[in-house]
Amino acid sequence: MSLPTLPEATDAGTSEPPKTQSRAPRIRSWAAGVYGQAAANALLLGVLINSGNRGLLSGLPGGYSAGTGDHYVLSSMGLHWADPTRYAGDWFLEAAPQPHWFFDTLTYLGSSLGILDLVYVLFWCFGLAAFGLAVAFLSRKWAPSMPWMFGAATTVLASLSPWMVVGTGSSMLALAIPAVVSANLVFLFIAAALTGRSRWMLAAAVLTAVVHVQQGAVVAVLLAALIVVHVVRHRVLPKATSAALAATAAIVAAGLTARPVAANTGDFVDICNELIAYHCAAQLWGTSTVLYSLATIGLALFTVMYEPSGNRPVWGAVVGLPMIGLSLGLMANVLSVPFFGELAQGLNVYRLGALVMPFAIMGLLLPLFRLGNKHLLAVLPLLLFTWEYLLSDSWAPVIPASAAFAAAYLAVVLIPVVVRSRRPERAVMTTRLSASALILLFLGTAVGTGSLTFRSLNTTYIPNAEVREWGEAVEKAVPPGESLLAPPLASYIRAATYRGVIADCKNIPYGGVPWAEWQERLGDLGGRDQCLDRNPQAYNGQSSEQLDRIAEKYDIRYMVVEQGQSDRIPELRELGWSTVLEPVNTIQNVVLHKTG
């Protein structure tokens, strides 16, 4: 397929342009084509995510960050490979290694070469590029008269959307982690399948399996569905797709064999119900969360209206199948259907939520770019889904529910429907103006709520300088191989010091013996309920004698006493503990050591 090109500049009277200028039209052609649009989408998305403040709601910095959040769990193994003194003897690292071998390798390479900050931000940018390319592919098929406007609207709305989608983290999370990058790769896989770009589709499939084993398994199922569609329609087995399926399945099988995601399905269901209900226990969700999830899926299913009838079987294989599977699993879980409800949890059907968001956004844009008087029956259910997904406070605090915003939104998206029905010759111009107004409405609202703060990109691993400085001091004071007695809620301690801990509320095994051991360890440290209610008193309320006995049980010789607990230091000294590190900065933590 040839890409659309810009008109060449009018000859200014010279007989032949110099050869040094011959590349200019090609560069302009590339910039105006699908790959130029993809780059623009990716850049816009990166700027908006880095300017976003959703992270502040969950204890993360604003914008992109590294060495925070899920990096507390996912970076440890690669850092240990690069420097065996880091996390040496850490119980969690030895008992429950994470399944992300590729991310471990990236971390190892980045840390070994002293460029971990750069490696992580490039990994994040790789995900942005995948998203940008997917949007560019689809915009040229679904909105061929104005692909750039469709792409910009999709990108802006996606960047402001909620970070939790049907129980799983969105691809808009401002972190360089496998879940984020793989979600964007799956989006690219689906977009390439829908637009007939087979090479990109097959490459995205294999890359997804490399980056994230669970999402690789999802892509393997979608590849199998595409093969079935192809065989039914053409009576021949697609060799390239079959080879990609074999490669993807092999990578997934190898990854799961080397590092099983969940050692015991029953244990994983218990973990869902007791510790991470927001992620995979829909029977415990509130009604509003369930309705929001169903509306998200419903909007994604509406994207079938963009597809010509001849390509809808392909859409059914890569969009319809996972969306229907997710909705069935969700409802089986919500209704606690015997066997099937727990099966949905055990298989972690909620991983499919990562596929939903970009298609839900494009479903929102249907009235703006496609619907007319032939589709009036579809407008009402679409608006009902839109109301639940967008206008019922689900996007708060970025986009708060308000009558003014709802009225402005409905006017912007419905005016093109009316014009397209009555004055089709003005439809393109009206759509352009309305799409521009929609983008300004969302950006203006986000700025007005303080949800966008334009900032420079901070790629530093552990961006908080004081936490980083304190962690470096502890790393020097506590010998390699030693672990720390520390509050379970203070997950930053393990991450910043590169020393193991007895257990914390962030590093939780997915089942088996490690899960039982984690429960015992948390029980000794004040109980696992503190991980749910975020109550530090469960640990801090224990006596100095109790803490001393815990240290003895787990052969721990170093203890972190956080600010606010310094009154217990004299008692601990009487029990044989001595200070090895005084407060370093405003983080008024003290590190104690016990000999013998």
Report each predicted region and the residues it spans:
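Transmembrane catalytic cores of multi-pass membrane glycosyltransferases
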Residues: 50-71, 82-100, 210-221, 225-365, ...
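Membrane-interface transmembrane helices that cradle and orient dolichyl/undecaprenyl
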Residues: 180-200
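Active-site lumenal/periplasmic loops and adjacent helix-entry segments of GT-C-fold
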Residues: 35-159, 163-184, 210-215
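Transmembrane alpha-helical segments
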Residues: 158-163, 382-420, 431-461
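Start-transfer (signal-anchor) and selected internal transmembrane alpha helices
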Residues: 1-55, 413-440
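Membrane-interface junctions at the ends of membrane-embedded or membrane-associated helices
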Residues: 18-31, 193-200, 228-240, 361-380, ...
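Aromatic-anchored segments of alpha-helical transmembrane domains
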Residues: 155-163, 209-214, 249-259, 322-334, ...
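Short periplasmic/luminal acceptor-recognition loop of GT-C membrane glycosyltransferases, typified by
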Residues: 449-454, 459-537, 544-568
